[in-house]
């Protein structure tokens, strides 16, 4: 192989082309590659941050859900306790009212019994006086009659 002027010319042209490319073409290509690499790295970082944020948000949502369930259970428990308390209060009020009505009824019964006893005593006294008058055949005066009825009522 002979080195001739054509080969030297081609080598010089290639060297000029390489130098031109290194001076004017290569820097923008390298800059574009670096920018693209930076965008890709930023995108990956953003994706990682988004994944972490999503995980944190899911954990926070889960925690809030657990707290809400606990609060709901607590509210339900308090409601059950309050309902039981209200039922017990109503029972106690009903018991007190029943005792009051019972005591009032017993007092009325006692009063009716006493008035019936008094009426019966008066009738027994009148019958006793009437019987005594018939036996004795004479009339007893009103004062003696009242005294006799009071004595009999006290004895009965």
Curated annotation (Swiss-Prot):
Entry membrane topology: Single-pass membrane protein
InterPro entries the record matches: ATP_synth_B-like_membr_sf (IPR028987), ATP_synth_b/b'su_bac/chlpt (IPR002146), ATP_synth_F0_bsu_bac (IPR005864), ATP_synthase_B_chain (IPR050059)
Cell compartments where the protein resides: Cell inner membrane
Gene Ontology MF terms: proton-transporting ATP synthase activity, rotational mechanism; proton-transporting ATPase activity, rotational mechanism
One cellular component term from this protein's GO annotations in UniProt: proton-transporting ATP synthase complex
Segments crossing the lipid bilayer: 12-32
A Pfam family reported for this protein in Swiss-Prot or TrEMBL: ATP-synt_B
Superkingdom per UniProt: Bacteria
SUPFAM superfamilies noted in UniProt: F1F0 ATP synthase subunit B, membrane domain (SSF81573)
Record has Membrane as a keyword: yes
Keywords for the protein's UniProt record, in alphabetical order: ATP synthesis, Cell inner membrane, Cell membrane, CF(0), Hydrogen ion transport, Ion transport, Membrane, Transmembrane, Transmembrane helix, Transport
Complexes and interactors: F-type ATPases have 2 components, F(1) - the catalytic core - and F(0) - the membrane proton channel. F(1) has five subunits: alpha(3), beta(3), gamma(1), delta(1), epsilon(1). F(0) has three main subunits: a(1), b(2) and c(10-14). The alpha and beta chains form an alternating ring which encloses part of the gamma chain. F(1) is attached to F(0) by a central stalk formed by the gamma and epsilon chains, while a peripheral stalk is formed by the delta and b chains.
NCBIfam families xref list: ATP_synt_b, PRK05759.1-2, PRK05759.1-4
Function: F(1)F(0) ATP synthase produces ATP from ADP in the presence of a proton or sodium gradient. F-type ATPases consist of two structural domains, F(1) containing the extramembraneous catalytic core and F(0) containing the membrane proton channel, linked together by a central stalk and a peripheral stalk. During catalysis, ATP synthesis in the catalytic domain of F(1) is coupled via a rotary mechanism of the central stalk subunits to proton translocation.
The protein, known as: ATP synthase subunit b
């Amino acid at each position: 192989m002979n080195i001739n002027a054509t080969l030297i010319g081609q080598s010089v042209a290639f060297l000029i082309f390489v130098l031109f490319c290194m001076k004017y073409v290569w820097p923008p290509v390298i800059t574009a590659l670096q920018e693209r690499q930076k965008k890709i790295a930023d995108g990956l970082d953003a994706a990682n941050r988004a994944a972490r944020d999503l995980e944190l948000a899911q954990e926070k949502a889960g925690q809030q859900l657990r707290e809400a369930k606990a609060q709901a259970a607590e509210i339900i428990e308090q409601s059950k306790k309050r309902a039981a308390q209200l039922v017990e209060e109503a029972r106690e009020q009903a018991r007190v009212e029943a005792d009051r009505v019972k005591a009032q009824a017993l007092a009325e019964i006692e009063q009716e019994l006493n008035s019936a006893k008094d009426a019966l005593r008066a009738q027994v006294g009148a019958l006793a006086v009437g019987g005594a008058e018939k036996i004795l055949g004479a009339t007893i005066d009103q004062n003696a009659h009242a005294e006799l009825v009071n004595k009999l009522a006290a004895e009965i």
